């Protein structure tokens, strides 16, 4: 399985590879080095990757040195500190690798999100639109786990399904366009699964606003890259049409929220290209900063009003 993200905010995409057997790999993209305003291109015109999982502490070795059977992985800034953290779903204890200045520490046990239920997949999403990323892990042996992020290392699990679904992988997206993230869980068909069952794929509709009468707001954003140069500033303004790899920081009055358009994760799936920001009770944003792949950031200082 793979999970792609710009973990070090240097403008290029890095690749995490979870392996069923053996240590996991992490390929750091070193095509570009430096800050967005002072970038150095390596002489090699092709992407230049170096494997650094062990160095960064995310190889996830087990005591028997065959790894922990990584089956799902996803990047997300769960603590809103402007760098992407990594959640790894294992057939063993899951991991939450907290990213602090490009140094990783497993905090899953401390934050009580290390589900040991044969997890196959994982998805980040702000399901209650409070400005913090929540977490959904798809499991085989027991029901899926839903962790609602309360902040300061606290998570609420009362929203977890109470039935066994045998989920292969999971993605989050606003299926019905109401501003609240829904979840699609792909069922796993096994010849000799638990109780001999063959599990059906499930679509979970988010009913948070119906049941809690939440007043939290939200913003959706769709980016589109261009092959043309507009600013004549010496930089190429070219970006792929789907804006893969673009990173956006939404500036609220008391909080900055970062999201990224990713190229893929887990068992051959990806989250929607449309970015979703929960804004808590804020009616508007102060602005946003868009970091296009491999170029200067573009800052929109105009007032952004929630949809």
Predicted regions and their residues:
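Beta-propeller blade repeat segments, especially FG-GAP/WD-type strand-to-loop junctions
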Residues: 23-52, 93-107, 142-157, 195-218
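Gly/Ser/Thr/Pro-enriched helix-cap/hinge segments flanking short amphipathic alpha-helices
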Residues: 155-167, 180-307
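Calcium-coordinating acidic loop motifs
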Residues: 5-12, 30-31, 76-83, 100, ...
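Solenoidal tandem-repeat scaffolds enriched in leucines and small polar residues
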Residues: 2-5, 13-25, 29-31, 47, ...
């Amino acid at each position: 399985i793979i999970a792609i993200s710009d973990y070090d905010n240097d403008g290029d995409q890095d690749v995490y590879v979870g392996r069923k057997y053996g240590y996991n790999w992490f390929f750091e993209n070193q095509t570009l080095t430096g800050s967005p305003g002072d970038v150095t291109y390596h002489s090699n015109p092709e992407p230049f990757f170096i494997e650094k999982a062990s160095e960064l502490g995310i190889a996830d070795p087990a005591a028997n040195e065959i790894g922990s059977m990584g089956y799902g992985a996803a990047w997300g800034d769960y603590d809103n500190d402007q760098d992407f953290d990594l959640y790894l779903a294992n057939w063993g204890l899951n991991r939450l690798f907290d990213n602090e200045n490009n140094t990783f520490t497993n905090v899953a046990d401390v934050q009580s999100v290390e589900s040991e239920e044969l997890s196959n997949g994982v998805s980040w999403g702000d399901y209650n639109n409070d400005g913090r990323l929540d977490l959904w892990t798809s499991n085989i042996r027991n029901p899926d786990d839903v962790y609602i992020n309360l902040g300061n290392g606290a998570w609420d699990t009362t929203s977890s399904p109470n039935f066994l679904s045998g989920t292969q992988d999971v993605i989050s997206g606003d299926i019905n366009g109401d501003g609240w993230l829904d979840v699609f869980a792909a069922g796993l068909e096994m010849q000799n699964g638990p109780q001999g069952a063959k599990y059906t794929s499930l679509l979970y509709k988010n009913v948070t606003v119906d049941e809690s009468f939440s007043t939290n707001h939200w913003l959706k954003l769709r980016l589109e890259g261009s092959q043309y140069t507009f600013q004549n500033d010496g930089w190429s303004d070219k970006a792929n049409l789907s804006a893969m790899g673009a990173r956006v920081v939404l500036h609220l009055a008391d909080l900055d929220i970062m999201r990224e358009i990713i190229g893929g994760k887990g068992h051959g799936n990806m989250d929607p290209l449309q970015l979703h920001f929960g804004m808590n009770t804020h009616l508007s944003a102060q602005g946003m900063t868009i970091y296009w792949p491999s170029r200067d950031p573009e800052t929109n200082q105009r007032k952004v009003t929630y949809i």
